[in-house]
Amino acid sequence: MSANRLYLYDSTLRDGQQTQGVDFTVGDKIAIAHELDAIGIDYVEGGWPGANPTDDAFFAAAPALRRARLSAFGMTRRPGRRPEEDAGLMRILDSGAPVVCMVGKTWDFHVEIALRSTLAENLEMIADSIAFARGRVAEVMFDAEHFFDGYKANPDFALRCIEAALNAGARWAVLCDTNGGSLPHEVEAITREVAARFPGERLGIHCHDDTGNAVANSLAAVRSGIRQVQGTLNGLGERCGNANLVSLLPTLMLKMGYETGLSREDLRQLTHVSRVVDERLNRAHDRHAPYVGENAFAHKGGLHVSAVEKDARSYEHVHPEDVGNTRKILVSDQAGRSNVLSLLREVGLVIEANDPRVDRLVRLVKEREFIGYTYDGAEASFELLARQELEQLTPPFELVSYRVTDERRMTETGVPFTLAEATMKVRVDGEMHMTVAEGNGPVNALDRALRKALLTAYPALVDMHLVDYKVRILGSGAGTDALIRVMIESTDGSGRRWTTVGVSSNVIEASWQALSDAVAYKLHA
């Protein structure tokens, strides 16, 4: 084994499921396991057999993995029982997984208070369970629960637990910062002492993020000689989460030069994998996530953009393509000519740098942002505005008028509900269309009325739908007198997403602006 080789253990499907609001289906777990396998993760922890029906169903229909090894998680035997008499231990050994990861106590406080056992029996539980498992599965790991707290309290006992596991045949002994309270300098010092006594190529690290240091603690452990790193995709996990493998992977490979099971080509799938997990969970992707966030390589200030255009290294620590991400130039009231020119080129608008229309467009953007518009994140509205100013846009339709009414009604059983109705007149290719549509709210009614008017002329609208709608009150206006900004995110059958913006003191008018821009962008693109 190369001294520079690290082994990656993903526990998204078990630890990640302990995140508040996360509830994987069996299909979710199988799909995510295949994504992890495809990029070259060494171990995929599928769950805890016997803990819940989902995990049982997952192992019963375990996916065939090409590159990763499937691991089942569980506990060492209970006090006072032999391994073969412990139903929980037998469930993980009978799960069919080639690897099992057993958690056991290494903090004397936990042994005496939580287990109501003795330190001597705890050592026997670790050794008995691992030795028994070694005869039944290909590989056994030991998760040393609360190791860092245990080491601080009683280093001799904590180390004897690691020794018992390794001597019994564990391939890896994983040092766990279970409470997430250790700091990087503590982790580095303690793991260096452990690695001086036991081979680093048999030691792992498992960190929680309760102090915001899970990634830093994992890196500190690697610097001290540990060679297995555990974590989860997007930092999922109970309480504050686990070490984020999505941040760790590129740091270990691109910054620290370690070898992993991933090739550089595999690493280019990282952004995709991160977003697949959020899509599966119906969660918004963290725009500010290191490496893979939408804003990880976003540039807003004009001086920054000008420098990036000359050499991306001036404001980017790695190439976005190396992790499957893309550079993003933002337009805002801080933007200069560099931002605008870069964005115009990106959308295929060719214009000379000294063209006076560029200055006019910059001024227009700043004026509109002053009254509440934002094109930082609403690039579709910016492109429409730019094409209009450059006289390169023919509006696909013209609004003549709209009227929206909201009516509160009662069901036959006396339950109140509201129904919105929109009446709209639009002109398409010189021909007037008047439509009426109902919706569960005014924006939904407007959307339906507009589609109804346009579908005959523009059948491509059939696969477009809105996926997000945000309202924000702007400025110092008092309550209902304030300006309102609406952002709408849309998508279509191709998977493209785009965001548009509208601003008004009337929420329906602001919504109309964002909605009409969304439709116009779809028809133009």
Predicted feature residues:
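A mid-to-C-terminal "edge-of-domain" accessory segment
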Residues: 5-6, 12, 250, 256-431, ...
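Short beta-alpha connecting loops at secondary-structure transitions
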Residues: 175-178, 230-238, 253-263, 322-330, ...
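Catalytic alpha/beta core domains of metabolic enzymes, predominantly
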Residues: 179-182, 189-310, 314
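A short, contiguous, amphipathic alpha-helix enriched in charged residues
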Residues: 440-461
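Generic long, charged, amphipathic alpha-helical segments
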Residues: 457-492
